Every structure is written in structure tokens, then in C-alpha cells.
Amino acid sequence: MPELTRERLGALRVQAKELLAADRREVLVCAGTGCIAGGSLKIYDYLKSECEKRGLKTRVALRHEGGDDAIHFKKSGCHGFCEMGPLLQIEPEGFLYTHVRLEDCDEIIERTILGGEAVERLLYELNGVRYAKHNEIPFYAKQQRVVLENCGTSDAEDIEEYIAKGGYSAFEKALFEMTDEEICRDILDSGLRG
């Protein structure tokens, strides 16, 4: 394995950001424990295989071969909204579907993946109002996520996507900018325990 340098890490981050910036069709299936218990991995497998049966190109990694028109299937981390799972998010529209079941998958493929339309009955509803997008839902709208800002939006199994979204930046700073003493002081000053 080649030596890790700041330049190599920076180049990898730039490449991954470029791949991530493209306005492509993405299907993010929550792979948090609550959603998995509700069947999200079966939903992921079914959606991906059914799209392939219909002749649609699919991919499961940020870096791939086969063209930019491939549908990117992702297993995301927990969205923090477990009682509404299994959750499914479709990009670029940003639709967030709740309580998704296997029986919903064919309609999702037809209406959303192929047609770009929301399946209204799967959108989050509160007091008679349906919310199409994650950031519109009152539960999320009042939150200011810092450490978990990418939770539910990233492929939990793709390290390049993690790096593109700033992953390892603290490690990079510690490795290339700080002394051992500064690292120890920052950790002690942070008050972290455990």
C-alpha cells in the first residue's frame, strides 16, 4: 500500500467530491438496526434486482464502471427516525418515504425511480400535512446536526463517499498539522470519556 500523504488524501477527496456532485438518481435505503428489523435490506435487494430485471443500470459504489446514468443504490446509516422505518430516500428529488414495505417497491420503481413523482401515501404525515423531503419534516427541521450531519445521507459502506463528505479530516489535521502534545491536549480539553 502506498504511503498516505496529505496530497494523496486531498486528491482522493477532490475526486470523490466530483463523483458525488453529479445530479444522479440515488436510492438510499436505511440500514440502521431499526429499519433492518423492519425489512429494509430485503427492500434494498428487491429494488436493485427489479431495476436490473427491467434493464436499468445499477451500481453500489461511488466509483464505478458502466456510465453516469446508472442508479446508485446505497445502504445509508440510521436517519434517527426509527419509529417511521423502514425509510427510503430518493434523489435527486429528495423524497423521503416512511413505513416502506416490499409491496410498495414496484410502485416506487414506476412512479418515482422512473417517473420522478412522489408516492404520496409513503410520505411522512403529521396533522394532515404530508412532507415530501427530509428537511421539511418538523422532527428534523428543528435539529442542528453537527457530528451526525451526514447520517442517513451517505452510503455507510463506501469509504470514498465518507472522505468526500469530510471524513478523516480531523485525522488529517492531527497527522499533518499537530504535535503529539497538541493532540493529547485537544482530547483532554474536549472532556471526552470512555
Residue ranges and their predicted role:
Residues 1-194:
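Feature of Fe-S/electron-transfer and energy-metabolism proteins
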